[in-house]
């Protein structure tokens, strides 16, 4: 052969194991024909060995067919035992039909046993559903979602440092996006609102420490107010806030409290009163001042301007320390008198504060007989904005007293508290109710930090009940999507926003719908609170707009989820420089970064969204697996567990389930207990199955290779017969033991083909089979079917072209033309994340 190869060139093409084309001399023709016959026969013999024997027409009575008939009867028995109607039917009374399960054996799982054997054992020893009587609320370290350990009050709680998070509106131009029209400002319009009294603003979570709890809540709200996150109520039409005002707030800013004169009467504090006042107040701007029409000062006519004392601010249960303002209907009241001897154009000192400027005279120190009203902003005089405030968009000269804050002096100075800096007064186009819509309480900041408090805001009326709102949906990546968008083999850096929700400003009219109180004062959220379902949607829009600009401007792969940013780049040194530039870019726009939770330098393994992500794989931390195994070991077989506790347990299992060899159908018995709100009891085999899942830990590859194998096996079924056909032309026909629904018969044949042939993919004309959603079937059969068909790909083929359609009707198979398509829905990936 070597000699022949030197003299002549021989080309061998492999087709069905033979030689298709041979170029040789005349003397080699006979030898070539011999080689073709020998090699072809040998390869055909190998094909016959690999091809399933029962699919040959001459081997219908073979051993393979008898084994297939046996497996089919086992599958049919699983279907016919209707688990859903008999053994998993919840019972409302503990009768003879529902007995407490017997004590199972201690958990000694055979780790080497295949998962399929453990699954079959669990279908024999079934878990049980019980009644609604009280049961165990603890499963290891887990407890029911609504039976959690009571919060412990800490009188030494510290209010965390909250900084002013005011992002610059230049971000709209720097980061062009359509999202900004929903964020500048954000709007919140509930259909209907339930208002509550101010006195119930703090939830009685700690009955033994009510006053201390309210005191710390008050400090927390004050800290939020000083950070510019809350409005503070002054009256029905006036609120104050700190920080820099936004553009939409400037048109409603005022420098003092004005009302229009009128003869309208109102009922305040239970008394019918007349709002007409005869005392006039000299305006703070000069008559001939050319800048008196300044955009942030609400000018009112001399003859119609009146200073209106503060109405009740929700603090009538606590008398003020420095005296109270006038009651509208009281006999003896404090009247604010005008002092026309002073001019508002007094000289200004170096700090921008008028020297002994008196626009209003001090209040009389007369005791009142009416109800006391608490006002923290005007304790004994009417104060406007104070020093240190700059007018946005327009410079203010010291001589222009119309824009300079005024304050009282003289007798009232010694009784008034220190003036507040950078305070703005807003008279919006809405009314500010003296009621609340949400309630507050404090808890530990987290399990590792019990020294600082966390404020919990309960606005649940907007997510459930008669006032429930349908909040907009937004794209959130699941595990499958995250695997497909993460780049492979790149160093990564994670960034975390500080106080992310407090970056999102609200429309003032929307803020009036989000009212809270510490029992004395009423506050309204100026920024998005964390207790409203709209806030995550707004934060998603916010970070998505930033992430798109970061990716475009710095040429780096960027992914954002809520307040987390993930940056990836092939060059670690370049990524390190980019991260510093990104932080500087965000900080220049007023967006704060939490450097405690930010990766300082590029790393190859990072923790993101609870997953451990390295260059090529995603996995769950080993500590989490150990905790879950410990919980499963502490399951007591035969005891009833409350459904709320099971709900907590299922949540942990669902998170790790994609990293196991199991499927969601294995958790269906616990889902049945949760849905029907009944007790649940574990069987010994079911507990072993759950433990087996945590032992078969696997890691998921990033950017998995998608293979589209050529289908070689097709299945079809009629109510009485089923068939399996192979692309080689062989087929096998089976008779069912009874008539069932057609989708069940189709699934039986697909499972049988998987057990006996083990193909990489299957053809079926049943959409029920191709979608792999078997929740309506009995649990043990659905679990087995899901486990069998999960690793293979199912293609849908129309019945007209199904190759197995002929054998199921006693006709020959036809593999000449069969158009097929996968029915699995394509995973949605945003355009900017594609191509990585």
From Swiss-Prot:
Biased composition, class Basic residues, residue ranges: 364-375
Residues holding Mg(2+): 496, 563-564
Alphabetized InterPro entries for the sequence: DNA/RNA_pol_sf (IPR043502), DNApol_viral_C (IPR001462), DNApol_viral_N (IPR000201), Hepadnavirus_pol/RT (IPR052055), Rev_trsase/Diguanyl_cyclase (IPR043128), RT_dom (IPR000477)
Chain segments annotated as transmembrane: none
Catalytic function, reaction form: DNA(n) + a 2'-deoxyribonucleoside 5'-triphosphate = DNA(n+1) + diphosphate; Endonucleolytic cleavage to 5'-phosphomonoester
EC number: 2.7.7.7, 2.7.7.49, 3.1.26.4
GO BP terms: DNA replication; reverse transcription
Site (Priming of reverse-transcription by covalently linking the first nucleotide of the (-)DNA): 146
Compositionally biased region (Basic and acidic residues): 285-296, 331-342
Region feature (Spacer): 251-414
Polar residues bias (residue ranges): 377-400
Segments forming domain Reverse transcriptase: 424-613
Molecular functions (GO terms): DNA binding; DNA-directed DNA polymerase activity; metal ion binding; RNA-directed DNA polymerase activity; RNA-DNA hybrid ribonuclease activity
Keyword field: DNA replication, DNA-binding, DNA-directed DNA polymerase, Endonuclease, Hydrolase, Magnesium, Metal-binding, Multifunctional enzyme, Nuclease, Nucleotidyltransferase, RNA-directed DNA polymerase, Transferase
Region (RnaseH domain (RH)): 704-836
The protein's role, per its UniProt record: Multifunctional enzyme that converts the viral RNA genome into dsDNA in viral cytoplasmic capsids. This enzyme displays a DNA polymerase activity that can copy either DNA or RNA templates, and a ribonuclease H (RNase H) activity that cleaves the RNA strand of RNA-DNA heteroduplexes in a partially processive 3'- to 5'-endonucleasic mode. Neo-synthesized pregenomic RNA (pgRNA) are encapsidated together with the P protein, and reverse-transcribed inside the nucleocapsid.
Name this polypeptide is given: Protein P
Organism annotation: Duck hepatitis B virus (strain United States/DHBV-16) (DHBV)
